[in-house]
Amino acid sequence: MLENEYQLEYFKENGFIRKICKKCGSAFWTLDPNREICGDAPCEPYQFIGNPIFTKHSLTEMREAYLSFFERHGHTRINRYPVAARWRDDIYLTIASIADFQPFVTSGVCPPPANPLTISQPCIRLNDLDNVGRSGRHFTCFEMMAHHAFNTDEKPIYWKDRCLELCSGFIESLGGNVFDLTYKENPWFGGGNAGPSVEVLMGGLEVATLVFMNLSRKNSGKPPVSIDGKDYYEMPLRIVDTGYGLERFTWASCGTPTAYDAVFPEMIPRILTAAGMEDRLENPEVERILGLNAKFAGLMDIRGEKIRDLRQQVADATNISVAKLEEIIVPMETVYALCDHTRCLAYMLGDLIVPSNVREGYLARLVLRRSIRMMQDLNMDDDLGDLVVSQMKTIGLANFEQDEDIVRHIINREVEKYDTTIERGTRTVQRVGQTYVKKNEPVPLAELITLYDSHGIPVDLMGKILKDTGAEFEIPDDFDSQIADMHSENETEKPVSPLAKYAERIAKIPETRKSFYERPADMEFDATVLDIFDNYVVLDATLFYPEGGGQPSDTGMLVTKSTMVRVDEVVKWENVILHKVRENTLKRGDRVKGVLDEDRRWALMRHHSATHMVLRAAKEVLGPHVHQAGSQLSTDVARLDIRHYTHITPEELKQMETIANRLVMENLPTMVKIENRVKAEQKFGFALYQGGVPPGKDIRVVQMGAEVQACAGTHCQSTGEIGPIKILKLEHIQDGVERIEFAAGFAALDAMQHIQSLLNTSADTLSVQTENLPGSVDRFFTEWKDQRKEIEKLRAKIAELELSRIEGINIGGVEVVIKQIDVSRKELVTVAGKIAERGGVTVLITTADGLGVVASSGTGKIHAGKLVGEVCAELGGKGGGKENLAQGAGADPSAVGKALLKAESFIRAEFNS
């Protein structure tokens, strides 16, 4: 497949020979005429452990060596992107360096930030989560060093030959011997693209991959190339997409037993000391075992049953039992995994991800809770927040937007939540286990996933609890990896627009001029009707804003000399705006005057602008991690959903309202610019994308003070035009998301006047001044509570009197009381309970606080739940409960007599059965 793509001048000119691996059958290129295997796992074991193949470099030194090398060879160094992929709407985390430039640069919509460029991009992949720590080489968080070139026919940069030349040159710059290097052919495809690629192998380790992306599933009209049974076509853009593993290069330069030893030279001793495992430090026997484990792991896929095979191979090679081996190696694997996870959390939280139960927050919580569990397994005397902050400091605090104290606070909150989750979730797991024991069925995997997803129970603890219940179950070794995979991509399907059926027709209509951007304060305009179909009118230009991004559309009128039609809704399809009218009496070519509903436009514009101000205030009060999770506007009120790790306090809400209004009073100008997407991202960062990711090469950037967003809505021309902002309500709508409801302008004035009216009415009712309301309400409430206690005491005495006066009937040798007693349900329960305690049966009905029924039974012959159900059915209601006590309610008070008779007949029938 693509064999001709590898017949390169670089290989020929430098003496490389194409060979076929005698073990796996793959084609590879080498300078060694005697080499017979490709150099990849599992064909060749690691050769560099204890025998480094590069000059020794720390992680920081290796990164700088790489970036400097490519800078010297004509590449522009660019800063890393965040690990939260907020410029993407399909993935949550940055999984590769090329992801930084997808989809807009790779599709040719936007130019790259530099060409060619070099970057060292932190990436997070959780698909091998369960292998981290075990294999010696897997990480959740790793840095992909890369050099990229974006080639077009008009502007070629470099292609395969130069890329290979640079790769060999970099390896030589590290002291590597190119004679030991192999380039293995391995065509790449994924995400609708494909191309030839080579794996770069040294010492049995894949250190880099060089992909030459030049094919796409999109038909370009050129002859197709078949890959994996699918047709691909030449792309106009040819992309050099490389990935060099920073951690792997560092490992190969140090020759340590595992990659973790090379990457975490400071964190490993700290964790070992905190876990009381200092004896593992610089222990030759432990190092020998770990090195063998890494070598054997490099030759196999260690998921599932393979982990047991790996244990046996290492045990055989070291002449110790598997049990003894696991005593040595399992705690070390946990230490390694904790080192990795804390670095992963440093990037996640440092790059402003907030743990939650959705999106990237879910993945952060998954890693965080695994870390908590690992610390518990190691009996560590250390703080998770301190470990993560220590990793941030090693990386460099300047690399992160989040403050270290907030990171600690977030982690402390998550640890508290975890403890509560375990306590509550344990009972749930026990119930599930008992249910499947009764069914005599194993607990299915789907149920186990639900227990984790909905209740947050770690898989190992889940297994222990289920085992104690006697339930049968099977938890896959890669359970956490499967969970992560389920949540790694945004698979939400966009709803089909009702306009889709008009797509062909709309495609023939010229783009609508968006006059609402040019003249946002104007309320009238002239335009020409371009098309009319169903109840839609298309104009050549419009001031009517179409619905989008949480902002409802404008409404108003379209007027001609002879007719007038009402515009109820405005929508957009690509670049054409459609006005939905009630009665379509217009025709093509008509000149119309558009007249907006002015009060509505101003209310929506004020609320949209106020949303920016409230968001800015939230960031100033709560921290830079605050990110918009959604918004919705109306003329009366607006709401803003934000991501935050804890509940917002009343004091914080007050500060936010003050800051938002201060920004209004500063009368800051609204600056709107159409900017190149890449330049805007470089200038303002990815906080631009608060309301989603707009398409296109250029984006509309709205700046109001320090708040800058890519935003398509209508805005006031200065913050002063917003008017007062009043926060009305705060809701905790889901874990990690707070909803702020507020009003602006005249809507805020109406809200404040309404609140004042309520205060005045309340003050009049209590005959006090408004400023004395809090004290008066407190006094009245205290008196009310005292009186209620007295009433409860009196009711209890009444219930005792009723109990002493009640005479029952004898049915089957049991005292049976069937009566209407008009006391509260609470007293009914007390009376019924006491009769049941002495072995009796009761049915008591009250109309004191609604039509209520209480039944009790002190004998096994009568089930109170069934009894109350029969009685309530007679009353037109429902009821149920336990065997000894049950309650219900009715709807028909006139049926009380019949219900009491029904109770007696049911009890007699039960005794006679």
UniProtKB/Swiss-Prot annotation:
<feature type="binding site">
    <location>
        <position position="711"/>
    </location>
    <ligand>
        <name>Zn(2+)</name>
    </ligand>
</feature>
<feature type="binding site">
    <location>
        <position position="715"/>
    </location>
    <ligand>
        <name>Zn(2+)</name>
    </ligand>
</feature>
<dbReference type="InterPro" id="IPR018164">
    <property type="entry name" value="Ala-tRNA-synth_IIc_N"/>
</dbReference>
<dbReference type="InterPro" id="IPR050058">
    <property type="entry name" value="Ala-tRNA_ligase"/>
</dbReference>
<keyword id="KW-0547">Nucleotide-binding</keyword>
<dbReference type="InterPro" id="IPR018162">
    <property type="entry name" value="Ala-tRNA-ligase_IIc_anticod-bd"/>
</dbReference>
<dbReference type="InterPro" id="IPR009000">
    <property type="entry name" value="Transl_B-barrel_sf"/>
</dbReference>
<protein>
    <recommendedName>
        <fullName>Alanine--tRNA ligase</fullName>
        <ecNumber>6.1.1.7</ecNumber>
    </recommendedName>
</protein>
<keyword id="KW-0820">tRNA-binding</keyword>
<dbReference type="GO" id="GO:0006419">
    <property type="term" value="P:alanyl-tRNA aminoacylation"/>
</dbReference>
<keyword id="KW-0030">Aminoacyl-tRNA synthetase</keyword>
<keyword id="KW-0067">ATP-binding</keyword>
<keyword id="KW-0436">Ligase</keyword>
<dbReference type="InterPro" id="IPR018163">
    <property type="entry name" value="Thr/Ala-tRNA-synth_IIc_edit"/>
</dbReference>
<comment type="similarity">
    <text>Belongs to the class-II aminoacyl-tRNA synthetase family.</text>
</comment>
<dbReference type="Pfam" id="PF07973">
    <property type="entry name" value="tRNA_SAD"/>
</dbReference>
<dbReference type="InterPro" id="IPR045864">
    <property type="entry name" value="aa-tRNA-synth_II/BPL/LPL"/>
</dbReference>
<dbReference type="GO" id="GO:0004813">
    <property type="term" value="F:alanine-tRNA ligase activity"/>
</dbReference>
<keyword id="KW-0694">RNA-binding</keyword>
<dbReference type="GO" id="GO:0005524">
    <property type="term" value="F:ATP binding"/>
</dbReference>
<dbReference type="Pfam" id="PF02272">
    <property type="entry name" value="DHHA1"/>
</dbReference>
<dbReference type="GO" id="GO:0008270">
    <property type="term" value="F:zinc ion binding"/>
</dbReference>
<dbReference type="GO" id="GO:0000049">
    <property type="term" value="F:tRNA binding"/>
</dbReference>
<dbReference type="InterPro" id="IPR018165">
    <property type="entry name" value="Ala-tRNA-synth_IIc_core"/>
</dbReference>
<dbReference type="InterPro" id="IPR012947">
    <property type="entry name" value="tRNA_SAD"/>
</dbReference>
<feature type="binding site">
    <location>
        <position position="608"/>
    </location>
    <ligand>
        <name>Zn(2+)</name>
    </ligand>
</feature>
<dbReference type="InterPro" id="IPR022429">
    <property type="entry name" value="Ala-tRNA_lgiase_arc"/>
</dbReference>
<dbReference type="InterPro" id="IPR002318">
    <property type="entry name" value="Ala-tRNA-lgiase_IIc"/>
</dbReference>
<comment type="function">
    <text>Catalyzes the attachment of alanine to tRNA(Ala) in a two-step reaction: alanine is first activated by ATP to form Ala-AMP and then transferred to the acceptor end of tRNA(Ala). Also edits incorrectly charged Ser-tRNA(Ala) and Gly-tRNA(Ala) via its editing domain.</text>
</comment>
<dbReference type="InterPro" id="IPR003156">
    <property type="entry name" value="DHHA1_dom"/>
</dbReference>
<keyword id="KW-0862">Zinc</keyword>
<keyword id="KW-0479">Metal-binding</keyword>
<dbReference type="GO" id="GO:0005737">
    <property type="term" value="C:cytoplasm"/>
</dbReference>
<keyword id="KW-0963">Cytoplasm</keyword>
<feature type="binding site">
    <location>
        <position position="612"/>
    </location>
    <ligand>
        <name>Zn(2+)</name>
    </ligand>
</feature>
<keyword id="KW-0648">Protein biosynthesis</keyword>
<dbReference type="GO" id="GO:0002161">
    <property type="term" value="F:aminoacyl-tRNA deacylase activity"/>
</dbReference>
<dbReference type="Pfam" id="PF01411">
    <property type="entry name" value="tRNA-synt_2c"/>
</dbReference>
